[in-house]
Amino acid sequence: MSMLQTLWRSDPAVARIIDGEMRRQRDGLELIASENYASRAVMEAQGSALTNKYAEGYPGARYYGGCEWVDQVEDLARARVKELFGAEYANVQPHSGSQANMAVYFTFLRPGDKVLGMNLAHGGHLTHGSPVNFSGQLYTFVAYGIDPKTERIDYDQVAEIARRERPKMITVGASAYSRAIDFAIFRQIADEVGAFLFADIAHPAGLIAKGLLPSPIPYAHVVTSTTHKTLRGPRGGIIMMGKDFENPFGLKAAKSGRTLMMSELLDKMVIPGVQGGPLMHVIAAKAVGFGENLQPEFETYARQIIRNAQTLAGALMARGYHILSGGTDNHLMLIDLRNKGVSGKAAQEALDRAAITTNKNAVPNDDKSPLITSGIRLGTPALTTRGMKEPEMEQIAALIDDVITHINDDHTINRVREEVFALCARFPVPGLEPSA
């Protein structure tokens, strides 16, 4: 109760809901690849008095007075994230990864422009051209995918499509692709067809920041990410640039004719283009998270994420599960359950009953609807934050298999649930105090 003392007194209905969610996080295994546990320090910054402050604009150029302290925290967040990724430019104001992506699209594209992005069913993301998303509704997307045999990105296919379609932008990144991405090849393809290269690294950002996966910063014209997932910070977005800080397309100001910097274009699109006031309490939490990411122990953590994912994938494959591409280089894996005769929805719901949280996910050539799917996606960032290592991944693989193999057996699911509770008790969530 100590984390919610005031709230219990003022609004017990909301306190009870939050307490229930805290119990769920503490007592269950979190395998959703996009989720993690923010530190107590991150949560304290996000719950601070900075939530009261409006600060439209940027440090030194605000539309409101009284911004001397929030200017400092935004400058600190920008400096830290630039150091973390080796970037020359950073904007830490986007409220989410999707809004960061929106700012990029709105800056460099016009409605109807052609964009090449990864097929959602092959591991892409909603904002990479899904017809139900603004990206697919405003722009003309063509898709690249994975090779049906290797289940990895087919770079020759990407180049072939790019030459044929001549997109204005190539979007690279994924939400359910388990292999390292060769950004250098994507840049070569983009340069060949005169396209703008945009990299969305929301999922593997923490692993990229510590040099464990290739970085797009030297290759992409612009890079976006979220700040949670493998970065383990607050929910939010960022935009970064490396060597292409100067405008490579020669865009000029209408009145003065001055060549515009890409940083100017992006900053103006974030505000006033797609947002108003920044969330200064979240920016403070981002600064705290970036500070944690810069510590040596974060590299140890990031390495363990990958080892855990590879161990979990190997243990599941040994039990007959089809993991796309035959393994993982990062923090996640996509499991095609069709050889098990189980839908993604059924697996997710059964695992939920066993206190193992996953998400159903479409797989290539899926014949089921997005609300059912033929696969599930698993990730190890949250498990690794709890301190779990390879032996626990072997145990968790066995528990997952027990549930899916006996998906309609309540006795088995209840037994697994008790084992999950015992395992979680051995590895408490850092900073998440037990309820009274």
From Swiss-Prot:
Obligatory cofactor(s): pyridoxal 5'-phosphate
InterPro entries: PyrdxlP-dep_Trfase, PyrdxlP-dep_Trfase_major, PyrdxlP-dep_Trfase_small, Ser_HO-MeTrfase, Ser_HO-MeTrfase-like, Ser_HO-MeTrfase_PLP_BS, SHMT-like_dom
Organism annotation: Roseiflexus castenholzii (strain DSM 13941 / HLO8)
Principal subcellular localization: cytoplasm
Top enzyme class: transferase
Function: Catalyzes the reversible interconversion of serine and glycine with tetrahydrofolate (THF) serving as the one-carbon carrier. This reaction serves as the major source of one-carbon groups required for the biosynthesis of purines, thymidylate, methionine, and other important biomolecules. Also exhibits THF-independent aldolase activity toward beta-hydroxyamino acids, producing glycine and aldehydes, via a retro-aldol mechanism.
Protein keywords: Amino-acid biosynthesis, Cytoplasm, One-carbon metabolism, Pyridoxal phosphate, Transferase
Transmembrane segments: none
Cellular component per GO, a single term: cytosol
Highest rank taxon of the organism: Bacteria
Subunit structure: Homodimer.
E.C. number: 2.1.2.1
Cell location: Cytoplasm
Catalytic activity, as annotated: (6R)-5,10-methylene-5,6,7,8-tetrahydrofolate + glycine + H2O = (6S)-5,6,7,8-tetrahydrofolate + L-serine
Family annotation (SUPFAM superfamilies): PLP-dependent transferases (SSF53383)
Gene: glyA
Pathway in which this enzyme or protein is active: One-carbon metabolism; tetrahydrofolate interconversion; Amino-acid biosynthesis; glycine biosynthesis; glycine from L-serine: step 1/1
Keyword Chloroplast applies: no
Residues recorded as bearing N6-(pyridoxal phosphate)lysine in the entry: 229
Alphabetized Gene3D superfamilies for the sequence: Aspartate Aminotransferase, domain 1, Type I PLP-dependent aspartate aminotransferase-like (Major domain)
GO biological process, one term: tetrahydrofolate interconversion
Record-linked CDD domains: SHMT
Residues bound to (6S)-5,6,7,8-tetrahydrofolate: 120, 124-126
Site location (Plays an important role in substrate specificity): 228
Protein name: Serine hydroxymethyltransferase
The family this protein is said to belong to: Belongs to the SHMT family.
